[in-house]
């Protein structure tokens, strides 16, 4: 996420156009998640349980028994396959499952014959969801950028008051947690406060304290700042109504894809070069024999975990 890139890293690290540009936080999370999955994979093996069998059971049996969804199928690598072979065989199965799901959403059922003859290449952004209006995103605009800056940026001076020892790193935390007044701020900050008051984002209450005026709206902005996406149907009716109003005002947009945009970018970064020039390109390199390392290299174990992850 953009917010996880610190000011020093933003200033010092060269960013490429059309690149994913993973930051240090991303790399740390990747390392931790791989270690966790490795531990899980090894523990299952010690219990004589294959992760591949669990995945097959989910698609072949669980969906049918619990949701009456038939004809989903997946063929995972055998126990004796090398990790090089596992990488090559599991990647087409990802496309296969995505095709099955796409047909299920569009037709209400999975037709194995249609799936088998389909030559359509699956792009993550094109996979629809059964849930309409699933994800909410912030529209890129000067207005939204200003709100994000004033409330959530650690570079905005509204966050820092000397009488509070500068203990908050953004204005949102300050106004929520402290009793602050307009005149607590230096003169050079007051024009920014005036703008927020004019836009009816904050107000002075009868005690002269600055408070958030439309809490639901600012909570929407806060979640989009910290998570970059909102799962629409997981929010309260009050928040959903505010989101609808913000969509009418052209502040937000909503989509119905299976994966959020961040998830799409994450998968594309690892599996192909369709979006980012610095991607791992695991899918194409393995399917076309241009992968790094020989066939017995440990790199294939790591890549297999990344694919499963």
Model-based region annotation:
Residues 28-181:
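Short, amphipathic alpha-helical interface elements at domain boundaries
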Residues 115, 119-123, 127-309:
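Amphipathic, oligomerization/interface secondary-structure segments
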Residues 2-75, 105, 265-309:
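Charge-enriched, short contiguous segments at helix-coil
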């Amino acid at each position: 996420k953009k917010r996880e890139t610190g000011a020093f890293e933003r200033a010092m690290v060269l960013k490429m156009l059309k690149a994913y540009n993973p930051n240090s936080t991303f790399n740390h999370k990747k390392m931790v998640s791989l270690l966790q999955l490795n531990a899980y994979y090894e523990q299952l093996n010690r219990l004589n349980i294959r992760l591949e069998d669990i995945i097959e059971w989910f698609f072949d049996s669980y969906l049918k028994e619990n949701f009456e969804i038939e004809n989903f199928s997946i063929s995972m690598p055998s126990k004796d396959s090398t990790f090089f072979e596992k990488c090559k065989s599991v990647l087409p199965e990802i496309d296969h499952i995505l095709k099955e799901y796409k047909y299920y959403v569009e037709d209400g059922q999975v037709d194995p014959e249609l799936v088998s003859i389909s030559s359509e290449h699956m792009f993550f952004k094109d996979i629809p969801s059964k849930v309409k209006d699933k994800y909410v995103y912030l529209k890129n605009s000067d207005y939204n950028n200003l709100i994000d800056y004033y409330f959530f940026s650690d570079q905005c001076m509204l966050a820092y008051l000397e009488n509070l020892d500068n203990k908050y790193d953004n204005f949102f935390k300050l106004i929520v947690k402290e009793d602050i007044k307009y005149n607590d701020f230096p003169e050079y900050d007051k024009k920014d406060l005036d703008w927020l008051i004019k836009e009816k984002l904050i107000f002075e209450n009868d005690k002269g304290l600055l408070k958030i005026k439309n809490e639901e709206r600012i909570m929407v902005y806060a979640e989009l700042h910290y998570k970059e996406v909102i799962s629409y149907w997981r929010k309260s009716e009050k928040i959903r109504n505010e989101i609808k109003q913000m969509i009418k005002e052209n502040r937000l947009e909503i989509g119905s894809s299976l994966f959020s945009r961040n998830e799409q970018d994450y998968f594309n970064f690892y599996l192909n070069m369709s979006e980012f020039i610095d991607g791992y390109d695991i899918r194409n390199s393995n399917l076309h024999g241009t992968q790094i390392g020989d066939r017995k290299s440990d790199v294939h174990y790591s890549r297999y975990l990344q694919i499963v992850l």
